[in-house]
């Protein structure tokens, strides 16, 4: 960890020196803090695609800088502080665990704009938050999972037991169960966003339990690589398309498309219209996309999945529509009732049918 931190600090110094050199040209400086490597093929890769889109959109009006592999905690606060001191006009902090650090640093630098991904705290006027309705994409993946499983056992690799992740678990299970009433779900918690070894171990543990469809809310391609070792096991790209594993084991993907948001928000800094806001877009807004469904999926299942995605996109269907019960059997949503955003944002329970407890 010490070696990685030292390397990260050195790399940050180089990146910020580059951004500082651009200040004489009055370029807007957009900076990005990443929890994983840009080569992870998933979460961080997609955020970096957004950064590159900013460069493509604004050309010589903007300079970007980034730091990858920044641990959540004190290291993140140091990186954000250094970025602010080095002349960044807007800083995107791209992991839930950066929330407190983002707000702490923002309070010290009121002239710098901060954008925190997946969080909810906006303690000062220069902090905005943004997220994607990942649970919408999970509904589509869940439908495919329910139709494709032969063992009737699907598995889910969770990162941390926070509402965003629990939403995805519940949405996947609800729609797998609708597609296949006999399906069961096992959840394994990796307690990491990005750790290929731990993610592979989690996938292996699920496969050993007889799971033949794996979903994940972790950042690397390791679960798909593990699935590829066992004939008949399939999975889904997470955050990015992960098309290298198509047509199987990767049969589709939930793709996070951050580019339009990053281009919009940097543009607002450039033209002086930036204002604090909270954004939570989904399939309809283009922030959540469904990756190509491979030929390993039967045509009728593909058509059903595409129809489900379309109904979510146009607002005619909400993935959390009753009747739905909580895990303990108590009524959560009555027939036709739709979950409100406040409940979803604080979700801390499983729906009926999921076995196991949410870690505290």
What are these regions (language model features)?
Residues 1-24:
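Gram-negative bacterial Sec-dependent N-terminal signal peptides
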Residues 24-360:
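A residue-level marker of the well-folded mature domains of exported/periplasmic proteins
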């Amino acid at each position: 960890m010490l070696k990685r931190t030292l390397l990260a600090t050195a790399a940050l110094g180089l990146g910020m020196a580059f951004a500082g050199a651009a200040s004489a040209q009055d370029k807007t400086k957009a900076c990005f803090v990443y929890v994983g490597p840009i080569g992870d093929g998933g979460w961080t890769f997609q955020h970096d695609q957004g950064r590159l889109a900013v460069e493509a959109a604004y050309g010589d009006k903007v300079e970007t800088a980034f730091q990858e592999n920044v641990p959540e905690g004190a290291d993140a606060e140091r990186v954000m502080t250094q970025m602010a001191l080095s002349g960044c006009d807007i800083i995107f902090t791209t992991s839930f665990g950066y929330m407190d650090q983002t707000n702490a640093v923002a309070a010290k630098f009121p002239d710098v704009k901060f954008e925190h991904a997946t969080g909810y705290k906006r303690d000062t006027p220069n902090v905005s938050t943004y997220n994607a309705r990942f649970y919408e994409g999970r509904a589509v993946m869940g439908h495919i999972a329910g139709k494709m499983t032969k063992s009737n056992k699907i598995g889910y690799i969770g990162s941390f037991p926070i509402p965003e992740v629990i939403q995805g678990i519940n949405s996947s299970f609800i729609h797998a169960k609708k597609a296949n009433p006999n399906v069961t779900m096992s959840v394994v918690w990796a307690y990491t966003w990005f750790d290929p070894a731990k993610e592979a171990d989690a996938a292996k543990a699920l496969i050993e339990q007889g799971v033949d469809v794996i979903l994940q809310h972790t950042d690397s391609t390791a679960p798909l690589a593990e699935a590829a070792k066992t004939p008949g096991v399939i999975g889904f790209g997470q955050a990015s398309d992960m098309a290298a594993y198509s047509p199987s084991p990767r049969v589709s993907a939930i793709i996070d498309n951050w580019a339009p948001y990053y281009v919009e928000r940097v543009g607002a800094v450039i033209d002086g219209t930036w204002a604090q806001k909270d954004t939570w877009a989904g399939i309809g807004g283009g922030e959540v996309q469904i990756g190509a469904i491979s030929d390993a999926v039967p045509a009728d299942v593909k058509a059903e999945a595409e129809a489900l995605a379309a109904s979510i996109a146009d607002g005619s269907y909400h993935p959390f529509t009753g009747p739905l019960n909580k895990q303990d059997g108590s009524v959560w949503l009555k027939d036709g009732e739709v979950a409100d955003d406040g409940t979803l944002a604080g979700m801390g329970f499983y729906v009926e049918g999921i076995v196991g407890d949410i870690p505290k």
